Structure formats: structure tokens, C-alpha cells
Regions:
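Kelch-like beta-propeller repeat domains
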Residues: 1-108
């Protein structure tokens, strides 16, 4: 899982059958982090399904074959910006069920 590799390797699926849109994603050292996001677990949006927001955080370490659940965000939200920095993963802004947010969190 070198960040400087010129080849792609498929990663294991996140442990949720629906997956998530709008997640915060990046790396902290060699560990990948995915947090937050939205999905439609009951039925698809085009069939009138209700969007849900998640606060779940997942990590994937080098050589591992499955994601680990690693805590939760302070609130369920998604669709912000994320940046991997030396200290961890910055999660910047986004929105939740109640509307737009301007919080900034550091996950490490």
C-alpha cells in the first residue's frame, strides 16, 4: 500500500453492504482512514428511500484483508474535504442531516 506505487491493487470492501457516498478519506502514516458518509439502506433514492448519515470511522492497515471499525465522528456527516497530513486525517466542513457544517476535525 505504498502511496508512491504506480500500480493499483483492489482493497477489501468496507463492512457495510450499501457502501457510503461522500466519505472523508486519506492516510495517517501507512494507515488508510475512511469516515462518515451517507447511504440509502432501506431502499434506493429513486424508489423514495431516505438518506441516512453515518459517524462511523474505518481503518485499513498495510497487509490487512479487512477494515476495522475505529470509533465515530462527533456527529454523523459527509461531503466535506479531507486531507492527509503528518498528524492524521483532517476532516473539513461538509453537511449533516441538519445542514452545512464548518467544523474541522483531526483523526489520528
Amino acid at each position: 500500500m505504498s502511496r508512491y506505487s504506480s500500480s493499483w491493487t483492489p482493497l477489501p470492501a468496507l463492512p457495510d453492504p450499501e457502501g457510503f457516498a461522500g466519505m472523508y478519506a486519506g492516510t495517517c502514516g501507512e494507515i488508510m482512514i475512511c469516515a462518515g458518509g451517507t447511504n440509502f439502506p432501506e431502499k434506493p433514492m429513486l424508489e423514495g428511500g431516505a438518506k441516512t448519515w453515518t459517524d462511523r470511522i474505518f481503518t485499513l492497515s498495510p497487509g490487512e484483508n479487512e477494515w476495522k471499525e475505529a470509533g465515530t465522528l462527533p456527529v454523523p456527516y459527509a461531503y466535506g474535504a479531507s486531507a492527509g497530513i503528518r498528524e492524521g486525517l483532517l476532516c473539513i466542513g461538509g453537511c449533516g442531516k441538519e445542514g452545512h457544517r464548518k467544523d474541522v476535525y483531526l483523526l489520528n
